[in-house]
């Protein structure tokens, strides 16, 4: 018989749609909890793409691509006006 995992300990993909609001309210939204979530995400990314036996530049290039897309989205408002100019 499978053991029942409490709602607080379930991952997001294991939560049913009806349980989602109560699952979100159980999360830790303190600064240390948010920092811990970012730290866990960083370690998961690092161990999956960077810290591997046969590593390549794929993991670092994904970070660079995300950085470029983020900065483009951030400055799109100014770039949009320059695109419409004819000479300068």
Swiss-Prot record:
> What is the annotated localization of this protein?
Mitochondrion; Mitochondrion inner membrane
**UniProt key word Transport:** yes
Listed transmembrane segments: 62-79
Q: Which residues carry this modification: Phosphoserine?
A: 3
- UniProt GO cellular component terms: mitochondrial inner membrane; proton-transporting ATP synthase complex
| Residues bearing PTM N-acetylalanine | 2
Which InterPro entries does the entry link to?
F1F0-ATPsyn_F_prd
Q: Name one Pfam family in it.
A: WRW
The modified positions for N6-acetyllysine read 16
Q: Name one GO biological process term.
A: proton transmembrane transport
Q: How does it sit in the membrane?
A: Single-pass membrane protein
Superkingdom classification of source: Eukaryota
- Per its database record, what is this protein's job? Subunit f, of the mitochondrial membrane ATP synthase complex (F(1)F(0) ATP synthase or Complex V) that produces ATP from ADP in the presence of a proton gradient across the membrane which is generated by electron transport complexes of the respiratory chain. ATP synthase complex consist of a soluble F(1) head domain - the catalytic core - and a membrane F(1) domain - the membrane proton channel. These two domains are linked by a central stalk rotating inside the F(1) region and a stationary peripheral stalk.
Q: State the name under which the record lists this protein.
A: ATP synthase F(0) complex subunit f, mitochondrial
Q: Which gene encodes it?
A: ATP5MF
């Amino acid at each position: 018989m499978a053991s029942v995992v409490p709602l607080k300990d379930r991952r997001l993909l294991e939560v049913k749609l009806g349980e989602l609001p109560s699952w979100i309210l159980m999360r830790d939204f303190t600064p240390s909890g948010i920092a811990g979530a970012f730290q866990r995400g960083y370690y998961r990314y690092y161990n999956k793409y960077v810290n591997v036996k046969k590593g390549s530049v794929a993991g670092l290039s994904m970070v660079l691509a995300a950085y470029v897309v983020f900065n483009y989205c951030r400055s799109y408002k100014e770039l949009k006006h320059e695109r419409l100019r004819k000479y300068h």
